[in-house]
């Protein structure tokens, strides 16, 4: 309780908005709508979307929905166009010297400069989402967590007998 007694006004605003949306939308609204309602309840007017190029269509559709209510800035993961080979990074296709790295630091910086008040992740890679969150000046929430194997539904691994067994046994886990 003491941590909330010492929370700043911004944190308490987010805490109240989150509780309000949880109470009103519990088991009623999809996450896409919860984010809209949360942003409104928190008093935000400028939202950011950091998205994976592989989910560009989903990001476009969500941006379209958000633009009816907010100012929106969005940034694709490949924004800086830096080849992985220049930084000595592992590549998906080692034969391609121009394979471009994802750039969560650039995404965060661009949305910071745009002055977004809440940033929404759409399918950033594991690790890239952590870097983006670390460097974002605004609070961050996720609409889509990338999972190429399970249709961007990572919780399915916990419900699926097959994947749960593999995860528990360490099969395929280095």
Task: Report residues per predicted region.
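Gly/Ser/Thr-rich loops at beta-strand to alpha-helix junctions
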Residues: 25-29, 51-59, 80, 122-130
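A short, acidic, amphipathic alpha-helical segment used as a generic capping/interface helix at domain edges
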Residues: 101-116, 124-128
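Short glycine-rich or small-residue beta-strand-to-loop segments that form or flank ligand, phosphate
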Residues: 39, 43-53, 74-76, 118-122
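Short Gly/Thr/Asp-enriched flexible loops that form oxyanion-binding sites at enzyme active sites
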Residues: 58-65, 129-138
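C-terminal functional extensions of proteins
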Residues: 141-174
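Short, acidic/small-residue loops that bind anionic groups at enzyme active sites
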Residues: 71-78, 131, 135-153
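Long, charge-dense
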Residues: 58-107
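Electropositive, gly/pro-rich neighborhoods at or near active sites that engage anionic ligands
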Residues: 1-46, 53-57
């Amino acid at each position: 309780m003491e941590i909330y007694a010492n929370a700043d006004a911004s944190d308490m605003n987010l805490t109240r908005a989150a509780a309000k949306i949880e109470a009103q939308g519990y088991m009623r609204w999809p996450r896409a709508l919860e984010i809209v309602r949360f942003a409104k309840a928190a008093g935000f007017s400028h939202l950011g979307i950091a998205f994976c190029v592989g989910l560009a269509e989903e990001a476009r559709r969500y941006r379209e929905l958000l633009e009816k209510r907010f100012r929106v800035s969005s940034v694709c993961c490949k924004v800086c166009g830096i080849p992985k080979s220049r930084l000595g990074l592992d590549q998906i296709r080692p034969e391609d010297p121009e394979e471009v790295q994802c750039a969560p630091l650039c995404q965060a910086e661009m949305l910071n400069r745009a002055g977004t008040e809440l940033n929404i992740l759409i399918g950033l890679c594991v690790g890239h989402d952590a870097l983006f969150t670390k460097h974002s000046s605004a609070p961050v929430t996720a609409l889509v967590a990338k999972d190429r194997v399970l249709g961007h539904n990572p919780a399915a691994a916990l419900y699926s007998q097959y994947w749960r067994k593999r995860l528990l046994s360490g099969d395929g886990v280095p």
